[in-house]
Amino acid sequence: MASIQTKLVSQPQTQQPLQNGFFNNYQQNIYRPQGIQSPPQQTPPSQPQQQPILPQQPQPQSQQPLHLQQQQQQQQQQQLLQQQQILQQQQQLLQLQQQQQNLIKQQQHQAQQQNFLHPQAQQVQSQLQLQSQPQPQPQPVNNVNNNNNNNNNNNNNNNNNNNKPFGTNNIHYSLVQQQQLLQQQAQQQLLQQQQHQQLLLQQQQAQQQSSLNNSLNSSGNNSTLNTSNNNNNVLLGANFNNASNPSINIGDPQLNNSNTNNVNNINTNNTNNNNKSGSIDQFGSPQIGVSYVNSSSNSAIPTPPTNQTNGSNSHSPTPVGINSNININSNLQSPQNIQQTILSPNISPNHNNNNNNNNNNNNNNNNNNNNNNKVSEELNEQLRMQQQQRQQQQQQIPQQPMQLLLQQQQQQQAQLQQQQAQLQQQQQAQLQQQQQAQLQQQQQAQQQAQQQAQQQQQQLKIYQQHFGQLQHQIHMLQQQPQNPQTQQQINGLLQQQAQIQQQQAIIIQQMQQMQQNQQIQQNQQLPQQQQQQQQQQQQQQQQAQQLLLQQQLQQQQQQQQQQQLQQAQQAQQQQQQQQQQQAQQQQQQQAQQQQQQQQQQQQQQQQQQQQQQQQQQQQQQQQQQQQQQQQQQQAQQQPQAQQSQQQAQQQQQNQQQPQQLNQNPPNQQLPQQPNQITQQQQQQQHQTNQILQNQQSQQILQLQQLQQQQQQQQQQQQQQQQQQQQQQQQLQQQQQQQQQQQQQQQQQQRQQPNQVQPNQPIDYNKKLELLNHPIWGKVLKETRQQIVLVYELLRMRCEGPHIKRNLFYQGIGLAPFSLSLPILSPSGLINATTGKPILKCTGSATSLYIVEDNNLFFQHNCGEQLVISKLFGAKVVPISTYESFLDHIVNILFNLTLLSPDELNLCTNRKNQPTFPLYQLDNKLSLVNQVQNQNQNQNNNNNNNNNNNNNINCNNANGTNIVISEVKNDINQLQPQQPPPQQQQAIPFVPSPTNDGNSVNNNINNNFINNNSFVNNNNNNNIQPTKSIIGVSNPFQNNNNNNNNNNNNNNNNNNNNNNNNNNNNNNNNNNNNNNNNNTNNNINNNINNQQQLYIQQQQYSQQQQQQQQNPQQQNPQQQNPQQLQQQQHLQQLQQQLLQQQLLQQQQQQQQQQQQQQQMQQQIQQPPQQNIEPINQLSDNQINMQQFNMLNNTNGNFNINNTNNLVRSSVQY
């Protein structure tokens, strides 16, 4: 990084804006951005560097002590060090940003290289693009050396005289403006890099058909733009950028690596008659001491010798324009000379130095020319090698399988991600180090200020003591007789007091100035901190953008991979189709060939047969001729006597011929020898036919084999396709797993939990965390689950975030369905486990009181009383009272440390575990079967003409008032006339240790056959409580003596009806059991969701309490920016969670509405009832009737509320 140099000029001048927003004003703030190297800042011993320090009041140096002067010098040195450190930190940050940008470029470049196509497709695509784009014009090779010479001249000349001091007396520039300039420079660099990338992409495509000479010509040409403006009264040259030249042709990116200094070196020159020169670099900062070019003969300046370019003369004027040799020097002079060159227009720079520098430059240029020739040859060889390697790679790429390419891409992506993560870690570490260093510096400065203040206070104390001593001496002298000596002594003492007062005033002023300086530094640090926060936010935004870019690149790569796979599949399908077509063509060709062969064979056979026939005919003719000759010879030799015999034989033959004609067909007129020949021909034909048949069968077998092979190939191809699909699925699964892992990591990074709404369900994972919390200690998991269930049910029932005790005690029969009750007893009883009395529980709204250990009575607001038996579990929760139980859950939030040791022992003792099942809530689906049971029981009651009802429905109105609604059929007709019968003995209740609720229901039905805790009274419609143990019946007297006979007759009919109803009830029970199992699962899920929400709320409240207990004693502007970011992130997450929760609530409401509609539809279908006339019953008949009903039917005690929460299987 180049050091940033700044300079201010106080004289105001007019501003002339240029193209890029920079002002062509030499008296504005002169700065050098990062692209231009400036000489190192050195301060001469006579003129030390002055930093911006507030002006102090003039004081005599004789009055200031030495240690104060030393302290001030130390402070100044520390301030200088702090500013240097801040500059170094900014440079490091800029370096890191550049590294990130380079990484992004590498990723894009690699992604472009990886996204290859088939070679043929690449050729087609490149041809189309080349047709649409203008091709670069070829240029001579010799221009490369010229351009390189110019660039080398510029680089060499800019590095001359770096050891000379640069003016530093008037340098004062604020860090805020520097940072703004750096931001502008970074934006310009980003724009330039984007343009550079676009040009690279275009030229890579164009260079595939261009030759090596053209690539060499385009690599070095136009890399520097040398322009001139021949104006008479212009002080500075024009400003140019890379974007202003549309014909820049950079060439291969690998060539650019060798010519990195050639880019962005845009130099401008200005020749004037008034001997005033200057130049503006790329970013608008003027360069001082520019040498003059021999552009006109009127110039009074001696022209230096120019470089020989393309055979031009040494003393000829150089043409001004592109590819011209312009020698520019940055001769840094003393500060006075620099001010003169800027402020005074008539003073010219030193020309002798320029001439000397030009001579040195010419020597350097000659060396550079030789080096460039060697470089060009090496570049030629490198380009050839690179092209050969690329061709080989392109030939090898289609042969590589897709899986290897995918793996390589994934590995490269992983490496890039690792590099980015490392860079981010380095950035974070550097930022932390910088923050720590700043804090240490601040602390040191504060300590030093404190030490100085203490020293000053001590000096003040010393002066005060000395002043008091002097006053005492004066007082003693004044008491003595006055003499001139005493007056002189008094005057001397008074002068010393005056000096002491002056020194005290000086110290006080210094202390005030220190305080003011501290305040000013604090005020200066505030904008710096704000800027740091802004920078961090910008870095985070950049990181987020980078992540988005990476995701987009990954998506593009995935899409391209999918496209490539699809193309590969299409190619395979085309290959398959081609193979099939080829196979069909082969089959057709084979069939045609076979036909042709058969035809040829037939023709050959016919020809052979014809030849054989011709040969046979010739043989026959020859034989006949021989026979004739023999006959003639014999005829000559034999006498005439034999002629008569021959004649006789001939006559006999002539007689035999007609007989043969009659016996044989005309075809058999041939002699015996031809018949033998035909038989041989037939045998030959038969053999040939067999051979042909064998050949045909072999051909058929071959065809079948070919078909089988084709089928096998098709199967293999199908298997390959399946494997590819499986691989794609595996890749998708891996991607999903990676996404899930990232989501899990993000969730783990969230330190603070989100706020939880009060009535929302807790997540299952949060519930597990709650149950496994270390605050429970050794408490059993069963007790933990029961406590959590109670709290969830209370939250589900009650409205609002807080639970009211009044609502709880009014709805205690509804909310804690799965509650395991504590061991409760009156104050007179003693608990068997602890040996201590257990107090009676009383609530705020109503009273809870106990008859015995096993039974609990509580009173509703309707004036009626119900009983909760031991079925809910009396020995699970070892808390003394119901109210304390609620306090532990609601107010203390599961803080079990407040429990007594006895209660904790009960919680951790395995012997106290329940041996009975724990009940849970019923869902709405179970209500359907319960309504059917109610309708059947009503049929039984109507048929029996009784006023007793087994099904007592307790409904909750508006969530607060509970009313027991009984189905009362003509209660007033029953009149008490006889005393009540004797009470029957109670059968003890022994619950089964199973976890199945059905077995408990059966036990209850069997055990409570003779129990009847509720009997209707004709005079009082309210149900009265019993004062005995449940399990002992206590019926009241009913005076119904007139209807005994009628009731006996009706009982016989009712028994028959009950038997039928029992069968129906058994079926209904089975349905209920299935529904209960389903609903229990749903309830458990809801409870788990609620518990997680509660835990999140608890953790959030604890963190808020900790923050309140340990507040940060810092200014709001000095807070850690990470905390602010975390808070913002948490707020966003909270909003997302709220939206999700609202959606879940809407879905649940919709489901509930659908279930309610189903229930109403089923309830609206009333069963057919057989109504019979009402008859009066006697007391004995009533008791017997109750006994039969309890024995044969299910006495369900159903308690309902507005939330459809039903307590199941509470039997009496």
UniProtKB/Swiss-Prot annotation:
Compositional bias (Low complexity) at which positions? 48-70, 119-163, 256-275, 322-340, 352-373, 998-1022, 1037-1125
Q: InterPro entries annotated for this entry?
A: Sdc1/DPY30 (IPR037856)
Q: Where is this region: Disordered?
A: 1-70, 119-169, 211-231, 248-374, 655-681, 935-957, 973-1125
This entry carries the following GO cellular component terms, namely:
Set1C/COMPASS complex
Q: List all Polar residues biased stretches.
A: 1-31, 276-285, 292-317, 341-351
Which protein is depicted?
Answer: Putative uncharacterized protein DDB_G0271606
Q: Which organism does this sequence originate in?
A: Dictyostelium discoideum
